[in-house]
Amino acid sequence: EYYYNDILTGTDGQMIMETGLGGTPIAGGTSEVTEAQDGTDIMLSIDIDLQEEAERIIAEGVETYQSESGSVMVSDPKTGEIYAACSTPLPDFSNLTDSSSLDLKLVSQSYEPGSVFKVITTSIGYDLGLYTPDTVYNVPARYTLGDNYVQDDDGRDYAEDMTVRYMLQHSSNPAMALLANEVIGPKRFAEGVEKFCIGQKTGIDFPGETAGIVKSYDEYDGTTAGYMAFGQSVAIPMIQIIRAFAAVGNQGTLTTPHFLIAKAGEKVDWPSGGQAIS
């Protein structure tokens, strides 16, 4: 509502008239009346039942895992309509002295997305026709990135043949680094990330959206693609991950995430964000 306050708020009417020195209107004097204007009605996509359930689930999750905060969003991948969205701490509308609770962190705060980025990585190479889900690669136990190396949490100390499907199912960090560096290649990887509009604002109709911090290809060093492949060396708001996942489920088409679906009784058309993958 704050985002749309300008159109929700009407304007007061006023009367301007000619008066004498004492403020008494002059009979037959000049006068001008401006009628009050009502605000514009809007319709939002929020489903109150889903919203309440989302708030309950995230509050329980944060308490269970003793997290600093948590966020959740439910949206339609084909339209971008948002049915539920919240971040902790949840706002207490009976006491809004702490306005920070009104912040939607999944829009306004950046973080390292981690393993969820692997969906983007595998999608980039698949879209380029470099592999199928069943293509097999020999993945080392440790994959060297600069002066460091990455390995999986399973304690594996030997190279293993993995299909791309297996890599994603088992969330293998060395496998993703290998795909980005040696199969896709850093330049094509950077181009694919850009096509997903990672590091660009989504255009969501909520105040405070940040673009995050994403290196361009010119800023890559020898480790950037490998780390980004599994969601490190990049900081973006959660809404960008949501939009990217939605594109994968929407035949590669990016949508604009939004709450507003109608204004003054007329449907609002939101622009497409372009084609991330085919």
Identify the function of each model-found stretch.
Residues 1-71, 91-94, 100, 264-274:
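Extracytoplasmic/periplasmic proteins that interact with beta-lactams or build/remodel peptidoglycan
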Residues 20-33, 76-114, 120-278:
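Beta-lactam-recognizing serine transpeptidase/beta-lactamase-like catalytic domain environment
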